[in-house]
Design a protein with these regions (language model features):
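Amphipathic alpha-helical interaction surfaces
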Residues: 85-90, 110-114, 138-141, 145
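Short, functionally critical alpha-helical segments immediately adjacent to catalytic or ligand/cofactor-binding
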Residues: 56-65, 71-91, 135
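Non-catalytic cell-wall polysaccharide-engagement segments
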Residues: 8-58, 117-184
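Substrate-binding/active-site groove segments that recognize
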Residues: 99-118
Length: 184
């Protein structure tokens, strides 16, 4: 609780969790930290993400072209949260491909190094927030290069994350992001 200086009366503090955009990982105890880390990383890459309108955005976020900057950032964070369902079931300690792919977004240390991520070791990539921050760098590079969210499934985010290469999973991800308040 804070005091309003002008009247010295108590003022309720806003519920920050209620102000966060919806993510598919909201059921996880780390949700608030992951969402904040992802939104911060997306804001740092507005040049390739929220500042652009990808050619196939209507499939994933129908109102994106008219959306505010915070809504656009929420879309990119929401997209990662939807892809993470398929990559790791939102498990930050997940390890796949014989230990080559790590964490919530199943990044390899090699990919992390190629993109100049702070998290490059196996241990660091198993930190959910660090993995997501790195994933934003990877995503920004791919989307910036291709000008699409997923294109034919092998472009944009689909370059690095297999769920977008599968039409059924790509459609489910798009249905989820499209239904969020920041995309309507």
């Amino acid at each position: 609780m804070a005091l309003a200086l002008s009247a010295c009366t108590p003022v309720a503090m806003p519920d920050l969790a209620a102000m966060m955009p919806a993510m598919r990982w909201d059921h996880r105890p780390e949700a608030s930290d992951w969402t904040q880390a992802t939104l911060t990383a997306v804001a740092a890459r507005d040049d390739a993400l929220a500042g652009k309108v990808p050619a196939d955005i209507a499939t994933f976020c129908p109102n994106y072209a008219k959306a505010s900057l915070p809504e656009r950032r929420a879309f990119w964070a929401g997209l990662l949260s939807a892809v993470a369902k398929y990559e790791s079931s939102w498990n930050p300690a997940a390890s796949g491909g014989g230990g080559r792919y790590l964490g919530i977004m199943q990044l390899s240390p090699r990919t992390a190094a190629q993109h100049g991520c702070d998290a490059q070791s196996a241990a660091a990539l198993k930190d959910g927030a660090a993995n997501l921050q790195c994933s934003v760098k990877v995503m920004a590079h791919a989307v910036g290069t291709d000008g699409v969210v997923a294109g034919n499934g092998r472009q944009g985010v689909g370059r690095d994350w297999m769920p977008l290469r599968k039409s059924k999973e790509r459609a489910e991800i798009a249905a989820w992001t499209s239904s969020q308040s920041y995309c309507r």
